[in-house]
């Protein structure tokens, strides 16, 4: 987990992890928070083990790479700090999915189809977001897993070379990792484990004060998408739906 301010969200996230049934070791990189986050991590009133490091806020993906490389676990789970886990078995369910044949990446939000330009097709999204999860239990195969929460075998992440730091602030990194997993002959899965996501507040902080920040962010997203679609032109478009599901989606899209 990488954090920069957002103390209230981080505290709520860490509190929600108390009930997790699967043992885990949390690694948090604090990228220069000035709102009490550092102090929270220093006193850390939670029962699970923590490794806390400090970094800069120039490249969050680089921070995540440094964080997961500090671990010695068989699996690595990347989690946004603005999430709250409701299902105590959320991690167990991710690990169970990764035990399925050819599984390589598991998460809680994703889409079954990516266009040639790298954009997802909205009607193929499946997720565990509350209040209305849409993914069928126990899991469904997808073309990509969103970075809000994803779990991957450490050896696979290492063989891929880690997260591609060229994307900067999250944009495109989840699509990139997902197709890299598929390139390695593995499948991506979205698991049924309900959770709350409080929605990109780190990235959008300050948009209401300075509209220029939003324009800059939009430009970064467009650049990241172009980078991704160029890098994986051999894999795009990507559609993991079966024939029956494609026909059903086609009919739904055309019915009034």
Residue ranges of predicted features:
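Donor nucleotide-sugar recognition loop
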Residues: 84, 145, 158-196
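Short, acidic, metal-binding catalytic loop of nucleotide-sugar glycosyltransferases
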Residues: 15-24
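Conserved donor NDP-sugar-binding/catalytic core segment of glycosyltransferases
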Residues: 84, 88-121
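Glycine-rich, basic loop-to-helix element that forms the pyrophosphate-binding segment
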Residues: 54-71
